[in-house]
Design a protein with these regions (language model features):
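N-terminal Sec-pathway targeting helices
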Residues: 2-21
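General helical secondary-structure elements
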Residues: 3, 26, 197-199
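Extended aliphatic helical segments
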Residues: 10-16, 43, 62, 69, ...
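Extracytoplasmic c-type cytochrome modules immediately beyond a signal peptide or single-pass transmembrane anchor
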Residues: 25-115, 224, 229-235
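Extracytoplasmic redox metalloprotein regions
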Residues: 84-236
């Protein structure tokens, strides 16, 4: 090869190698991320802090936001337009929450794990409720009180019914995410398309197979839940 061409190829190889190393370093940092959202205020930490479930069982936040819209027909009758609030989940006034807070109900946490923002339930889902001083008064949130309106069995049934629906696919989720204007970078979009949605579906159906004992029990109803049987089913 002419000397000039050989020199050009050498520099091109160096540039390509440098770009590959930068890309590898970026992916290594991204995929090693494990950072839960935390709060200095202990009450906020109780309501929205992580108890660890968002790492192994967390659902990508954009999927969480899209599910009650994409599968609204499985929400409780007459409450199809309420989203997660249809199950008694409590939402606070966004004006009273910190800047940059990702909208979600009390009792849910956020964790960036493997580069994807995930959300899952925490203790406050069962241990926070609201009280009105009068019928026309605004509800006041009290942490630590029983969540007397939450219907976790209906929530569980919704999640399972959604996972069994033929629209639980990357194409349908990504289309709904785009319609809602949710932020999703190209890498996470590719991850959801190739594996993320399928992984969430498989995990839901695996958990559902362990919760089949609930089919033989009376419906728990709002404010009641079989606390320890699901935990035993998951851990055994």
């Amino acid at each position: 090869l002419p000397r000039k061409l050989a020199r050009w190829l050498a520099w091109a190889a160096i540039v390509v190698l440098a770009l590959m190393l930068l890309a590898a370093a970026y992916l290594a940092i991204r995929l090693s991320t494990d950072r839960a959202e935390s709060f200095d205020d202990p009450v906020m930490q109780f309501k929205y802090g992580s108890t660890g479930g968002d790492k192994n069982f967390g659902m990508p936040y954009v999927m969480w936001q899209a599910m009650p819209v994409l599968f609204r027909k499985y929400l409780p009758p007459g409450r199809e337009d309420e989203g997660w609030a249809a199950f008694g989940f409590i939402y606070e006034d966004p004006a009273e929450l910190p800047d940059g807070f990702r909208p979600r109900p009390i009792g849910t946490s956020m964790r960036n794990y493997l580069g994807i923002e995930r959300t899952f339930l925490n203790c406050a889902i069962c241990h926070a409720g609201t009280v009105r001083a009068a019928a026309e008064a605004e509800p006041i949130v009290y942490v630590g009180m029983p969540a007397n309106r939450i219907d976790l069995q209906a929530f569980q049934d919704f999640i399972i019914a959604s996972a069994l629906d033929e629209r639980f696919t990357p194409e349908d989720f990504l289309a709904q995410i785009d319609r809602m204007g949710l932020e999703l970078d190209p890498i996470n979009r590719l991850a959801l398309r190739l594996i993320g949605v399928y992984q969430v579906r498989e995990r839901i159906l695996t958990i559902a197979s362990r919760f089949r004992f609930a089919e033989h029990e009376p419906a728990f109803g709002p404010g009641r839940f079989d606390t320890f049987s699901p935990a035993k089913a998951l851990l055994n």
